[in-house]
Structures are given as structure tokens and as C-alpha cells.
Amino acid sequence: MKKKREKLVLKSEIIAQMPKVELHCHLDGSLSLSVIKELAKNAGIHMTMSDEEILEKAQAPENTKNLLEYLQRFDFVLPLLQTYKNLELAAYDVVRQAANDNIKYIEIRFAPSQHLLENLTLEEAVEAVIAGLSRAENDFDIRANALVCGLKQEPIQKLQKLLPLFDKIPDEHLVGFDMAGDELNYPQEKFVDLIHDIKIKGVNVTLHAGECPACEKNILDSIAMGASRIGHGIMTKNLSEAEQKMMIEKQIVLEMAPTSNFQTKAVTELAQYPFKELYDKGIHVTLNTDNRMVSATNLSKEYEKISAWYPDFSLSDFEKINHYAIDGAFIGQEEKEELHQRFTKEYKKISE
């Protein structure tokens, strides 16, 4: 019976049925085609491009040359995300897509500083996103929260302006802080004081780290600074056994995103990709989309990739990584327990 179940997990219809948690999803990289067109219309931008031409600008090629080519895709959508109305709609759209993918809990991250070209304040940008999340929660069977993201290449004075948001917006949907960007030229150690000030406020922290070759020190620095989760963390594979053991003991969660990790050239071949190796060691790995539109993916497709790459990765393994994600989610213990119970029940039903 067990073998039969493990073969079932390879089928896309079984994967579609699985309840899922997603911790690492960027708002601006995850808009649907229909909503990109609606956002353009709202912004008074007359798009003469065909759907194929829009996708060519919004999606990175499967074989992206480098990280820069991948990041250029964000330049296309950012001008559309400069008003309260459009940010609210964008947030709603991403949660709607997630709900259709049977995601029951999602955290969506975005950099408020990227959305101020039409005179929104940082506070208004965050409130717009939260409004979209709340509206989607009312319409779909999903819980959604927001993370504020700082960009490492921005001046520290600008990044410090994000801190008061956690005092001004006491909304339960604003649950954490992240930093993304060029970790090679802006290593984690440059932001020790900033993260210290965030942690003093009692804010949950996840940090992008360990995406580039020889960037594993950023992972250790992130943990030392108080991050309970690491965005991507591919170079965890290069850490010593003692360092990896420390991550297991601290229950540090890795937010991995297979499609994106290959497109950004964090790895270039499957043998280098450490998802299964780290999972087998007991490290708390999770699966995420990173950017639904830019990577032309959804969470079910990421699960299908893992099933294809590691045929022995069973239904119970997928259940386990979702429990890891629940444990790492920036929510209260009571809500975590509810999700744990629900997922245990639903995965049991799928396996029968």
C-alpha cells in the first residue's frame, strides 16, 4: 500500500489537492496576466501589446542568462503599482491565485519604498496591500499576511524609515520584516543595527541569504542577528556539520523556490541543488514560488518538480515540509495548532 501511495504523489491531480503553506512570495513578481492588464488600464496606460508580448516582458526565460536578466522583469510591472487602488488589487490577485492553488496560509512580501512614485506614503502603501489581503480572505478559504521588505542597496537612512511602520500599523496582517537584494556587495553584517532595532520592536524577521556562491556567511550572520527564517539559503549546503546542526536545533526554516533558484543561477544543475540533501539531514526546508509571474509557476508546479527530481519524496514528506512551514509562519501558536490539525486531517484523507 505504501508504494502505491508514493506513486500517487507524482500525479498532478493529487498535488493539486494537497493543502499548502507558502512563506516566500513577492507581490510585484506574482501578478496574473489579466490583472496586469487591469492595473495598466487603472493607471491610464494604454497597452497595445498582445498577451504574448506582455508575458515576454513580465516573465523571465527558463534559461535566464543571469540574475540581472531575471530582475529586469520587475521593471515592467512596478510603474503599475503606484496607487492605493492598484496595490490593493494586486494583493487581492496574488491571494486569489494562491487560494486556487489550495494554499491555506500565505505570506506576501513587498518593498513599500518601490511604490511611492505617485505620492503614496509608506504607510498608505502597506495599508493598501493589507486591504487587498483582507478582501481576499473574505472571498476565499485562505489566511494571508504581509511582510515589509527592505532593499539592501538602499541607503540605511531610507531603510530606517520602514521601522515606524510597525508602530503606525498595528494590524494583525503585518507580521514581519525581510531584506532582499544584492547580498554579495551588501552583506548582512552591514545591517546589524537595523535588524537589532527591528527585533527590539518584537518584529519577526526573515532575511534573504545564501543565494550566491560563497555567500554562506550571510546565512550564519542572519541567524546571529535574530532571523528565524532564511530566504532561499541554498549555500546552507556549504556549512559545516556543526553549523547545520545548530540550524536544526534552532528550527531555522529555509524558504526554497526551485524554479527561481535555477533561473537566478543560485544553482545551475540538479546535482548542486540541496533541497533533498538538507531535508534528509533534518533541516526545515519549505517550498515556495518566489515570483509566480516572473518564474511562470505556482506552488503545485514546484511540488511537481520536486516529485520528478526525487521520486521517493512521498506524500508524507510533502506533509512534513508543510508542517515545517506552519511552525515557521509568523502567526500565533493557536493559529499554528489549527493549521497543523487541519493539514494532518486533510493529508490523511488524501492518503486513504
UniProtKB/Swiss-Prot annotation:
Domain of life: Bacteria
Reactions catalysed according to its record: adenosine + H2O + H(+) = inosine + NH4(+); 2'-deoxyadenosine + H2O + H(+) = 2'-deoxyinosine + NH4(+)
Active site: E211 (proton donor)
Family named by the database record: Belongs to the metallo-dependent hydrolases superfamily. Adenosine and AMP deaminases family. Adenosine deaminase subfamily.
Positions with a binding annotation for Zn(2+): H24, H26, H208, D290
GO cellular component, one term: cytosol
Gene name, Swiss-Prot/TrEMBL: add
Coiled-coil intervals: none
Free-text comment on the cofactor: Binds 1 zinc ion per subunit.
Pfam family, one: A_deaminase
GO BP annotations listed: adenosine catabolic process; hypoxanthine salvage; inosine biosynthetic process; nucleotide metabolic process; purine ribonucleoside monophosphate biosynthetic process
PANTHER family: ADENOSINE DEAMINASE
Cofactor(s) in the UniProt record: Zn(2+)
Enzyme class: hydrolase
GO molecular function, one term: adenosine deaminase activity
UniProt protein name: Adenosine deaminase
Chain residues that bind substrate: H26, D28, G181
Keywords: Hydrolase, Metal-binding, Nucleotide metabolism, Zinc
Job of this protein: Catalyzes the hydrolytic deamination of adenosine and 2-deoxyadenosine.
EC number(s) per entry: 3.5.4.4
UniProt cross-references to InterPro entries, sorted A to Z: A_deaminase, A_deaminase_dom, Ado/ade_deaminase, Metal_Hydrolase
Site description Important for catalytic activity, residues in chain: H232
